[in-house]
Amino acid sequence: MGDNKEERKKMKKTRYVALVLLSSLLTLVGCSRREILDDYPVTGINIRLDWEGVTGRLPEGVRVIFYPKDTQGRKIDTYLPAKGGEMKVPPGHYLAVIYNYDTEVVQVKGEDSYETIMACTGNCTGLGDSETENMVWGPDNFYVATLDDVEIGKGEELPTLEVRPKSVVTTYIFSIKTEGLKNVSSIIGSVSGMAECYHLGKGAGLCRFAPIYCETGKGNGVIKGSFTCFGHPELTQARADITQFLNLIIVRVDGSRQEAKVEITEAVKPPKDEPGEGDEKPQESEIEIELPDDEKIVVDDVEVPPDESG
């Protein structure tokens, strides 16, 4: 019995010594790791964002991601005020993206690399009609700046980088002559073949063939509406291989439905850049779709339910 008690004392003492040694070892490792982190060369950069001519209403702030082009640097992801600020970045060569994060429907995904970072919107929900379930929302205001070669040196002086973001969302408005508007109760609209996603690294709108929801209504002898999409026309990829359509589901006053499809491929085709203009050509934030004079929708007559109010 006494031998067991003595043995337990020895084991307890041994465990105590082991714990002390382990604690000392962890302390040494922790100090060493802190020294390594403290010695890791981190300089910085001052980013100034110029919004003049871009928008009169500044976003809440921006997200800035630096992607290393070599083994010297490492990925840096941070948030700055709308007008920019200072951020710590290790020396090296970088690719970088900057965008506003205060969007309502735009979702950024694929942030792991410059080659995959992309902005898209989600599916339409809450509209109360099954016809809208396969549609996606048009994007709200989204501003992007991309930098394909930023060199961060080891000097103590903080360099300043002047950057001007650009809007990558365009609003299109349309008006289609319509006969029989008295038969129309409501309209569900979408556009197909336009860019519902935006590749930040490539600076291009991407079409993944999801119809984009359109705001629609009745005007004076017309069905009118608008939609937004990613990228101005000259930035959208593969436009020559895609046909664009306005798709309208017309709900008539008796509850029946009529579909109308209007091709807008030529109307939304981007103008060719003039020699020497390049990226300096100002982009239009709103474009009116001009349709041929003979383009017209005829809504079939239906029996209008009697007015029971009187």
Task: Tell me what each language-model feature is.
Residues 9-18:
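Bacterial N-terminal signal peptides that target proteins for export
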Residues 28-30:
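C-terminal motif of bacterial Sec signal peptides marking the signal peptidase cleavage site
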Residues 32-35:
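Bacterial signal peptide processing site
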Residues 48-59, 175-183:
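Structural motif
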Residues 74-167:
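Short, low-hydrophobicity acidic/polar segments
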Residues 136-220:
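A sequence/structural signal for flexible, mid-protein segments enriched
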